Design a protein with these regions (language model features):
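Contiguous beta-strand segments within globular domains
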Residues: 40-78, 82, 536-544
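Intrinsically disordered, low-complexity Pro/Gly/Ser/Thr-rich segments with frequent PxxP/GP/PP motifs
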Residues: 99-135, 569-594
Length: 671
């Protein structure tokens, strides 16, 4: 808690530093009567299109200005304010709740400065870091300085605007802390219940902004892309979409992407409803889609980006799936209790998740990005200046640089103002005291890291979809095994089931109903033709069946035959049914007894053995006597043969005697 106390102490000092200070401005070259605050004409505007931000040594800075006020301007004033004391002081000044004192000023006459073809004006002003000289801006100490730029016509201020510069000492070696900009490409589901997908204008525009941002930003960023949106973009028949897809893949080279489920899901609700296995399948599908569509791009599968609050039960399961890092967006940080500020990497409380890191996007910076005003240059500079102020606060409060993770993003992760983020990234890149990196990979934590306490279990559900999703999953896993591995229906059905559990989809029942209709359509393409009865004249034989496949591709099934008075020597093999044809199948059987009895024939899926057709019942006749009956029959046959032999011999004796019964001929010697 020491770090939190130190930050609170800094915040108290901010109240004094940010208090309104009225300092008379003596503008060089004007009369004493002009030393007070000039009149302000509020109708005109002035915007900063480009400016320097980092100042290491004295520099002739150039500010490119635009706006309606420039048409009647004769001078531009630069008012350098007292440097900000800390982040709270910075926000009070940036949000116009406080006006800091002016420590230096410079006036530039613009009547001799050539204007651009677009009416812009590039105004030079010297920022001096060594000494104060006439008509320059002296920034004596390192820190973030507010700078007011105002346009005047004589004594009348036509317009003014606020920006910041960051003065750093090149001789001082600062302690670097990690920082990253997080950007996410997502949007409403692009698939329909009938299996088709369409990229609408909003999704296309979001993708263009995302790609343009990647092409312009030179530093490392943390990225996540919705696999479902990427899938639709890759399959779009529009030539411009194909070009956009290739631009995206080119812009991602050398970067990594955080894996995600195929569409946005609520892991807490799925865990509550007992759908942990479905959550696992959703993530596997999303990861497989990214790997298939982004070959050569590193897919980070160890980080989970949470947009809604998590509980300990869900975090424990995510850890079992291999997630070792959590990124909490502003919506996911609600209800958690922290031992340290959100900028400090932490771990979930409890021993079950001790090696899972927790990082949080900055809530205040997210609010700034969500309501970004002014030009991209001004918004980007403000973001960079606030990040540096936050960094200085953390270091001053004693935070270990290795434990700091500054994550900049909008509230949703979407690129609300990509141009401003580009300016911020460029301003922060190679800034003293900061190290810009991709935070999508694993972040090492130990028990020494502070804890973040999550609720034990949250009561969010999918609203009664549990049974429908479970039943659809069982049917899908079984029936898709009937198709060849490369059949596109396999992927389409998996995608439909994934979309049905997304909280952003209002017509989830239509996706499930459409999926089950497709599954039934495939099973209906298989028909079974059986004889009404069969006759077996020996102990073993075969049952001959015919299967017809009316589908356009080969279909695979198994034949399951059962009877209480028959044995089936072989397990049912997978049978390939050729498209549009009839296949004859012979099932080996072995009779246990003779007589008439029913034989039930079922056609089932290769996996899961889900019934494909209605069962057929065949009457079997077994006429062969087996076992003891065969022994008795042989014995009777032998008796019959013996009787016949005896009868034959008696007949021979009656007709002329049996030669075997006549005495031997010859002389018998006397005894």
């Amino acid at each position: 808690m020491t770090l939190l106390r130190n930050l609170r102490t800094l915040a108290v000092g901010a109240a004094v530093a940010a208090a309104p200070v009225a300092v008379p401005l003596a503008v060089p070259g004007t009369s004493a009567a002009r030393a007070g605050r000039p009149d302000v004409a509020t109708a005109a505007t002035v915007d900063i299109l480009a400016q320097p931000f980092r100042v290491l040594t004295s520099v002739n800075a150039r500010f490119t200005l635009a706006g309606t006020s420039l048409a009647g301007a004769d001078s531009v004033d630069f008012l350098l304010h007292r440097r900000v004391a800390n982040r709270d002081s910075f926000r009070a000044i940036a949000d116009n709740f406080a006006e800091p004192g002016v420590i230096d000023s410079a006036v530039v006459r613009v009547n001799r400065i050539p204007r651009g073809d677009d009416g812009t004006l590039t105004v030079p002003v010297t920022v001096n870091t060594a000494q104060s000289t006439r008509n320059d801006l002296f920034a004596p100490q390192p820190g973030v300085y507010p700078l007011t730029v105002r346009v005047r016509d004589g004594d009348t201020v036509l317009a003014s605007t606020l920006t910041f510069i960051d003065r750093r000492d090149p001789e001082t070696v600062p302690t670097n802390v990690p920082i990253s900009i997080f950007a996410q490409l997502t949007g409403p589901v692009t698939h329909s219940p009938d299996g088709t997908s369409t990229l609408d204008d909003d999704a296309r525009a979001n993708t263009v902004r995302f790609v343009t941002f990647l092409e312009q930003v030179g530093s490392a960023v943390t990225l996540q892309i919705q696999p479902e949106l990427l899938d639709t973009l890759s399959e779009s028949p529009e030539p411009l979409d194909a070009q956009l897809f290739e631009r995206l893949r080119a812009a991602l080279r050398g970067r990594s992407v955080i894996a995600s489920t195929y569409t946005a899901v609520d892991p807490v609700a799925m865990m509550h409803d007992g759908l942990s296995a479905e959550l696992t399948e959703q993530f596997r599908l999303g990861e497989a889609t990214l790997n298939r569509l982004l070959p050569g791009i590193t897919i980070q599968r160890s980080t989970w980006v949470a947009h809604d609050p998590l509980d300990r039960r869900t975090i424990g399961f995510l850890g079992q799936l291999g997630f070792t890092s959590l990124v909490l967006m502003p919506g996911a940080a609600e209800g958690v209790e922290r031992e340290q500020p959100g900028a400090i990497v932490s771990r979930p409380a409890g021993k079950e998740s001790v090696f899972v890191s927790v990082m949080s996007t900055d809530v205040q910076l997210a609010a700034t990005l969500d309501g970004s005003l002014g030009t991209a240059a001004q918004s980007g500079v403000r973001i960079a200046a606030e990040v540096i102020s936050q960094r200085d606060d953390l270091v001053a409060a004693g935070a270990a640089p290795a434990d700091v993770r500054l994550l900049v993003s909008s509230s949703t992760g979407e690129l609300v103002d990509p141009d401003a983020l580009v300016v911020a990234a460029r301003s922060l890149s190679n800034a003293p005291g900061l190290f810009v990196q991709d935070l999508g990979g694993p972040q090492v934590v130990t028990e020494r890291n502070p804890a973040t306490v999550f609720p034990e279990a949250l009561n969010r559900t999918l609203g009664g979809l549990k049974t429908s999703i479970q039943q659809a999953r069982r049917e899908l896993d079984a029936i898709q095994s009937m198709l060849p591995a490369d059949d596109p229906r396999r992927a389409r059905w998996l995608e439909s089931l994934a979309i049905s559990s997304s909280p952003g989809v209002s017509n989830t029942a239509e996706f499930i109903d459409g999926l089950r209709s497709d599954l039934r359509r495939l099973t209906a393409s298989v028909s079974l033709v059986t004889p009404s009865d069969i006759t077996l004249s020996s102990r073993t034989g075969t049952v001959r069946l015919q299967l017809r496949n009316d589908d356009d591709v080969p279909v695979f099934v198994r034949i399951a035959v059962s009877s209480p008075k028959m044995q089936f020597p072989q397990d049912p093999d997978v049978i390939e049914l050729l498209p549009g044809g009839t296949t004859e199948v012979q099932v080996p059987v072995k009779a246990r007894t003779n007589g008439r009895f029913p034989v039930t024939v079922r056609v089932v899926t290769p996996i899961g053995r889900v019934q494909v057709t209605s069962p057929a019942v065949i009457t079997a006749r077994v006429s062969e006597v087996a076992g003891l009956g065969q022994l008795v029959s042989i014995s009777l046959l032998l008796v019959l043969l013996a009787w016949w032999w005896n009868s034959w011999r008696r007949g021979r004796r009656t007709d002329g005697g049996d030669p075997l019964d006549e005495p031997p001929t010859g002389t018998v010697s006397a005894q």
